[in-house]
């Protein structure tokens, strides 16, 4: 294990991950699902963190290979899994192994996405890259609120990962310059060395983010001069010298691309997960966090419990129109194990306020005055929000890795 400085200017922790068995021809890809453990300060056990990084690196390598070789041809309407199978199945060698691996690992989810995306390929709101990846870009919302405890496209990890990959590639290359409008004959196939270099770049970036925390990338929480947004990360394509995807050549270019993609996924995952936390109500005065989002809501609640002078105590109603009562439970428990205690609109407003603070800290938003507050004993709300963000980011990456 060593601390390196990447070509993007960000420190990354390099962790060697051995190839796992059963990779089905996709270089270094483990088929183990990632899980969450409690042995790490950031919420992931060491072994599970490696599994998550390895799985994500394999998935993102497959997406890059598809983008490079297919150029969008054969993917429209047929589904990503089907397009890969048809386009690569007869090419032999690396292409054949990649086709078999991706169809085995991803085929079900991707064919489902393809059928969804195929219905939207004529929409003017979907970019060419979204269309090629079978993504309905209109299905993702910043707030997921409904009348029932239901799931949506935003809760599908594969849909999320594909959408993030699409956004990052557009940031790096722009529409029409990323290989998605090529002919059905396909684009340039990266060599085995270039594929390995890309995968190493993704692995290094994700390992650094999950090991050191997003706060280290932004500079001590992003609150004391750290860079917010995409600054300093190469996500604007600056690290690639303005080249298009089809113009990349050699391991150095592909490792920089992998580092940019891994960094982008690592920066987007937690914020997107916060945006996707869903709630439902059984009346205008009683709300609940959706069951599938309660583990993440608990992390937010633990942050809120550190600052009662800012967030107060949770309030609830036993039934519509009944008396509002102050809960004797902590925010963490009230949000994650509400029983039949519906949270009041005022308490939900406090929950959303805390979400906003954590998102601001994760994005390095130095202009949010709320992050400068001090708690009991001089504790910094901004730093604690960033620590909560690190844990949430790792949880989000763990879910994506289990796709």
Curated annotation (Swiss-Prot):
Secreted among keywords: yes
Record localization: Secreted
Residues covered by region (Disordered): 113-157, 173-195
GO CC terms: extracellular region
Transmembrane segments: none
Pfam families listed in its UniProt record: Harpin
Principal location listed in the UniProt entry: secreted
Composition skew (Low complexity), residue ranges: 113-129, 137-156, 174-187
Alphabetized UniProt keyword annotations: Hypersensitive response elicitation, Secreted
Biological process per Gene Ontology, one example term: symbiont-mediated perturbation of host programmed cell death
Record flagged with keyword Secreted: yes
InterPro entries, sorted: HrpN/Z
Task performed by this protein: Elicits the hypersensitive response (HR) in the plant upon infection. Harpin elicits HR in non-hosts and is also required for pathogenicity in host plants.
Family as reported in the entry's similarity comment: Belongs to the harpin HrpN family.
Protein name per UniProt: Harpin HrpN
Organism: Erwinia amylovora
Gene transcribed to yield this protein: hrpN
């Amino acid at each position: 294990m060593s601390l390196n400085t990447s070509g993007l200017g960000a420190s990354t922790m390099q962790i060697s991950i051995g190839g796992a068995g059963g990779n089905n021809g996709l270089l270094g890809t483990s088929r183990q699902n990632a899980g969450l453990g409690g042995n790490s300060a950031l919420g992931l056990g060491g072994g599970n963190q490696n599994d998550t990084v390895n799985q994500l690196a394999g998935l993102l390598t497959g997406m890059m290979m598809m983008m490079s070789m297919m150029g969008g041809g054969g993917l429209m309407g047929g589904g990503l899994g089907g397009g890969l199978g048809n386009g690569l199945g007869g090419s032999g060698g690396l292409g054949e192994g990649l086709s078999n691996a991706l169809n085995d690992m991803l085929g079900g989810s991707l064919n489902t996405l393809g059928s969804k995306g195929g219905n939207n390929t004529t929409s003017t709101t979907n970019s060419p890259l979204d269309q090629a990846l079978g993504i309905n870009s209109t299905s993702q919302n910043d707030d997921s609120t409904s009348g029932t405890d239901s799931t949506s496209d935003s809760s599908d990890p594969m849909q999320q990962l594909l959408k993030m990959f699409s956004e990052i590639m557009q940031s790096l290359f722009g529409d029409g310059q990323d290989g998605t409008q090529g002919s059905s004959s396909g684009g340039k196939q990266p060599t085995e060395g270039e594929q390995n270099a890309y995968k190493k770049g993704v692995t290094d970036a994700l390992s650094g983010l999950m090991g050191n925390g997003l706060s280290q990338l932004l500079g001590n929480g992003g609150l004391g001069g750290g860079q917010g947004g995409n600054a300093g990360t190469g996500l604007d394509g600056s690290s690639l010298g303005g080249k298009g995807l089809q113009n990349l050549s050699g391991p150095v270019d592909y490792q920089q691309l992998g580092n940019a993609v891994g960094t982008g996924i690592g920066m987007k995952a937690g914020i997107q997960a916060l945006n996707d936390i869903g709630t439902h109500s059984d009346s205008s005065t009683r709300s609940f966090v959706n069951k599938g989002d309660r583990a993440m809501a608990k992390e937010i609640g633990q942050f809120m419990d550190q600052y009662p002078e800012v967030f107060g105590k949770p309030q609830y109603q036993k039934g519509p129109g009944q008396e509002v009562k102050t809960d004797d439970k902590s925010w963490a428990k009230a949000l994650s194990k509400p029983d039949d205690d519906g949270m009041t609109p005022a308490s939900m407003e406090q929950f959303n306020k805390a979400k906003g603070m954590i998102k601001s800290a994760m994005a390095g938003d130095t202009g949010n005055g709320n992050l400068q507050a001090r708690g009991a004993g001089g504790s910094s709300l901004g730093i604690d929000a960033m620590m909560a963000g690190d844990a949430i980011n790792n949880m989000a990456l763990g879910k994506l890795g289990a796709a």
